């Protein structure tokens, strides 16, 4: 019985390690800070990935610039090729002897100068195209947006149009032009323009009447002017009217 009791006690107080503890390798369970080191490594990896993505984005942004420069270079190269071809053609024309057989020395010189001028103009045109220079000037170069811009634009347009005011077709041209440019306006805007033209018409009528009145005052008096006035004065002497008047007329 005693032996059985000892065996019982031994079985009862045997310490059994938990299954989870036995599965954990030795030395790992005691390191409480190991997980934090792993998290730091993960964070470092994320930072590296973000930096790599930023570098890739920067490279992608730079690619269009490179391709754009390449396109510009190709365009310039193509223009130079065309210009070179034109210059060769001009050179052939300058050196062609058969073209000058029937020309006088003066005509040959004039032809050479003309071809030289064409070559210079061609070179200038190439330079303008290369650097993106716009040939537009004056009205064509304007793009009005503010009130001052439209005022300046109107001045230039007026100078351009009024140089043809002596033409017989000028009035009909303006009539059609005003109608066409006003066709898209609102009623209120059309009324303003109509009122402005009405006022202008009234002013022109007043000026015309004043001008006609001045011409009448400066005109010749009916009946002979000064001569008729002197004749009337002599007629006031009664009986001497016929004789003196006749002598006066003969004298005049």
Curated annotation (Swiss-Prot):
Q: Does the keyword Cytoplasm apply?
A: yes
- Biased-composition ranges, Basic and acidic residues, are 57-107
Q: GO CC annotations? A: eukaryotic 43S preinitiation complex; eukaryotic 48S preinitiation complex; eukaryotic translation initiation factor 3 complex
Acidic residues bias spans:
36-56
Cite the entry's keywords alphabetically.
Answer: Coiled coil, Cytoplasm, Initiation factor, Protein biosynthesis
**Does the keyword section mention Coiled coil?**
yes
Q: Where in the cell is it found?
A: Cytoplasm
Citing just one GO molecular function, the answer is: translation initiation factor activity
Q: Which InterPro entries does its entry note? A: eIF3-like_dom_sf, eIF3j
Query: What are the boundaries of the region Disordered?
Result: 24-107, 209-232
- The protein's superkingdom reads Eukaryota
Q: What is its main location?
A: cytoplasm
Q: Give GO terms for biological process.
A: formation of cytoplasmic translation initiation complex
Q: State the HAMAP family in the record.
A: eIF3j
What's the family? Belongs to the eIF-3 subunit J family.
Its biological purpose is as follows:
Component of the eukaryotic translation initiation factor 3 (eIF-3) complex, which is involved in protein synthesis of a specialized repertoire of mRNAs and, together with other initiation factors, stimulates binding of mRNA and methionyl-tRNAi to the 40S ribosome. The eIF-3 complex specifically targets and initiates translation of a subset of mRNAs involved in cell proliferation.
Q: What is this protein called?
A: Eukaryotic translation initiation factor 3 subunit J
What organism does the UniProt record list as the source? Gallus gallus
> Coding gene?
EIF3J
């Amino acid at each position: 019985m005693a032996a059985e009791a000892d065996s019982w006690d031994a079985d009862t107080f045997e310490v059994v390690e938990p299954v989870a503890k036995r599965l954990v390798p030795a030395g790992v369970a005691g390191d409480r800070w190991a997980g934090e080191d792993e998290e730091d490594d993960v964070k470092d990896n994320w930072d590296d990935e973000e930096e790599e993505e930023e570098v890739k984005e920067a490279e992608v942004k730079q690619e269009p610039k490179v391709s754009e420069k390449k396109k510009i270079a190709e365009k310039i190269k193509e223009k130079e090729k065309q210009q070179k071809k034109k210059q060769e053609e001009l050179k052939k024309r300058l050196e062609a002897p058969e073209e000058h057989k029937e020309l006088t020395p003066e005509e040959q010189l004039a032809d050479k100068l003309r071809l030289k001028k064409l070559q210079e103009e061609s070179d200038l045109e190439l330079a303008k195209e290369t650097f993106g220079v716009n040939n537009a000037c004056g009205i064509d170069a304007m793009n009005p947006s503010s009130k001052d811009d439209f005022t300046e634009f109107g001045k230039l347009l007026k100078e351009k149009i009024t140089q043809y005011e002596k033409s017989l077709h000028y009035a009909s041209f303006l009539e059609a032009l005003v109608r066409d440019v006003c066709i898209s306006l609102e009623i209120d805007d059309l009324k303003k323009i109509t009122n402005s033209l009405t006022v202008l018409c009234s002013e022109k009528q007043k000026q015309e009447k004043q001008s006609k009145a001045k011409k009448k005052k400066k005109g010749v008096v009916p009946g002979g002017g000064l001569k008729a006035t002197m004749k009337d004065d002599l007629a006031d002497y009664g009986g001497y009217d016929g004789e003196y008047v006749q002598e006066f007329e003969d004298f005049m």
